[in-house]
Amino acid sequence: THALLSQTLQLNKVGLVIIDEQHRFGVVQRAAASARGQSPHVLTMTATPIPRTIALTLYGDLDLSLLTDMPPGRLPVKTWVVPESKRAAAYEWIKKQQTQIFIVCPFIEESETLTSVKSAKSEYAKLAKIFSESNLGLLHGKLKTKDKQQVITKFRAGEYDILVTTPIVEVGIDIPSATIMVIEGADRFGLAQLHQLRGRVGRSSSQSYCLLFSPTPSDRIKALETVTSGFELAENDLKLRGAGNIYGTSQHGVPNFKIARYDDFSLIPHVQKEAQRLLPKLNELPLLRDLVEKDKIDLIQPN
């Protein structure tokens, strides 16, 4: 777990560091994990890379392998952004599906300041009336570990038809019989988190669905309707939010280069190839050598 990153923990002879769910770690945390030992090999895994990670693969700092095939028999999850005006119709459609359902809310309890953002506790009470013929369960992070496990066990066993929950189900939940994911306040989540939540369904041969409710659906959220690949979503996120600071710790934001553009995807491989060709010849190219030896920040950022 994250305990590996403790400064008091001394580890020697670490040759390989594997980071799963990479998007859940910060830049400093990932650097601390990979610093254990003498420059260990690092393998990071994620279904939805953050913009900075995509940029690092583009700039050649990370080698990339893509797993593009779905498990046999699986179907892509159909995703719809649902306007508030269609909420009642969406509920009626859900009632007819005869399947298990996740309903994810951003908050556990109602907020005094963000009154329009739905909470799991209040939605549980409302939905129990709307879906009066269904059995509902409630899951959130404030429950005791034993109680959380009991709720998940009952949902997996089919004792609950609908699980009202917070994003606590984002990882580690595998319930193939659940085929509908409803996400309230989709604008409150990042693309990576939305894609991870969507991945809780579509785990059987049955068609699965993801319904995204948002008061102001953005292009970022609408992209989920047509894009099923986590990597393609991450590329969209890179274009929309920027790559952050390659030399620093910011994981998004548009870098302010003098000339180059971070999203010149087709040009970057050619630049890499040219840099690799010229680097061994620096002693023969004194002007270029002087540039390379200068502080890179002064070269790439405008005054």
Feature annotation, model-predicted:
Residues 1-222, 281-282, 287, 303:
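Inter-lobe coupling/hinge segments of SF2-like helicase ATPases
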